[in-house]
Every structure is written in C-alpha cells, then in structure tokens.
Amino acid sequence: MINQAPKRSDEPVFWGLFGAGGMWGAIIAPAIVLLVGILLPLGLFPGDALGYDRILAFCQSLIGRLFLLLMIILPLWCGLHRIHHAMHDLKIHVPAGKWVFYGLAAILSVVTVIGVVTL
C-alpha cells in the first residue's frame, strides 16, 4: 500500500542555500578578495576607482546592499551546512543539530540583514 501522506523533507531548501553559497564562494568571493585584498593595496587598480566615497555610495545603493547580503549570507549557510554534515560524518551527534546549525545560520542572516539595512 502506498503511503498517502509521505513525510516532506526540508533538506532541499538547505541544499539549495548550500549550493548557492558554494558557487558564490568559488566564483565571486575569490574575485573580490583578489580585487580588494591584493590589487588595491598594491596600487595595481586604476586611480580612485574604488575610493572610500565610491565604495560607500555603492554599499548604500540597493544593488550594493544586495551584493553585501549575498557576499555574507550565502557562504555563511554553505559553511554551517558543511560543519553540520561533517560532524554527522564524524559521528559527533549534536542534540538537535539541524536546529543548532541552521538556526545559527538563520540568526546570523537576520543580524546581517539588520546590519546591511542600517548601513
């Protein structure tokens, strides 16, 4: 007999955030680290293209705030998802581990949203 009320899994939502964070961390984040962490301090980037005033104006725009949110939140979800599953693989069982790790990711995401909105 087929179960008429199968248990729904919430795992696809977390895997989606994990995948998005992994892609962001693999493609976008290294480019930003290269630009801001290496090229700018060495003076290899043209003039005042990324001066304080321009960066502040970008961060206060809608697209800049969205970029900051994605730059912080997606790798955060990816990292906490990896830690959650790594602990499971190592047979270290945290009581209510899903609530601990994904709850922490959700709380830190809300803190990030508050911080970026008040920027």
UniProtKB/Swiss-Prot annotation:
GO biological process per UniProt: fumarate metabolic process
Keyword Transferase set for record: no
UniProt protein name: Fumarate reductase subunit D
Membrane topology: Multi-pass membrane protein
Compartments it resides in: Cell inner membrane
Molecular-function annotations in GO: succinate dehydrogenase activity
Function: Two distinct, membrane-bound, FAD-containing enzymes are responsible for the catalysis of fumarate and succinate interconversion; fumarate reductase is used in anaerobic growth, and succinate dehydrogenase is used in aerobic growth. Anchors the catalytic components of the fumarate reductase complex to the cell inner membrane, binds quinones.
Main location (coarse class): membrane
Family named by the database record: Belongs to the FrdD family.
Ranges annotated as spanning the membrane: 25-45, 55-75, 99-119
Keywords tagged on the record: Cell inner membrane, Cell membrane, Membrane, Transmembrane, Transmembrane helix
Keyword Ligase carried by entry: no
Subunit organization: Part of an enzyme complex containing four subunits: a flavoprotein (FrdA), an iron-sulfur protein (FrdB), and two hydrophobic anchor proteins (FrdC and FrdD).
Organism superkingdom: Bacteria
Entry GO CC: fumarate reductase complex; plasma membrane
